[in-house]
Amino acid sequence: KKAQLLAILSGLQPRKDNQRPSENKLAIQYGQVDASLLGQYEASVSYQNSKEITITLKTDNHSYIGTPLLDKDARVMETERGETLYKGKRKVNGLEISEWWNKQHDNYSSEPAINYNFELVIHEDKKGGNKLLELSMDYSIDLLHADNALTEHELVALWENITGTIKYHPTQW
């Protein structure tokens, strides 16, 4: 284990924050590491902005393929008090993506809220060595303090803006 860790640490290289990783490198904040040194991995990064929108990116390099997003049970995706806003496939920059957007009403807790969840998956089948990408966006509206909350229309526009920037390069996202 120590030798593995030292190999990974020796493979770390500096990188500007807005610079794409080179070759088969996995990006980390202000750095990159050779993905082949990691063996089998699953990586995720979450970001929350000042409006409390959480964006999460996930990828992995293992061969396990789970239930495709659009084949998942609606009761699981929507939960008991939820509804689907959109479920389907579309093309973005030549990539076929699967998406499921939903909204849940939580009126039964001490802090009633509306929770939005947007999910996107690319290369679910992992065919041809393509790397899986999962992207999600979550947002909650506290109904007791909803004065400056984003509207559903604004959230959809933001999601479409974000997903419209996705481009695939065979060795990197």
Go through the PLM ranges and name each one.
Residues 49-129:
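Signature of long, low-cysteine stretches enriched in small and polar/charged residues
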Residues 33, 44, 50, 67, ...:
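Generic signature of intrinsically disordered, low-complexity segments enriched in small/polar residues
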Residues 1-30, 135-173:
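Surface-exposed amphipathic alpha-helical segments
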Residues 129-135:
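Short, well-ordered strand-loop elements centered on a beta-strand within folded domains, enriched
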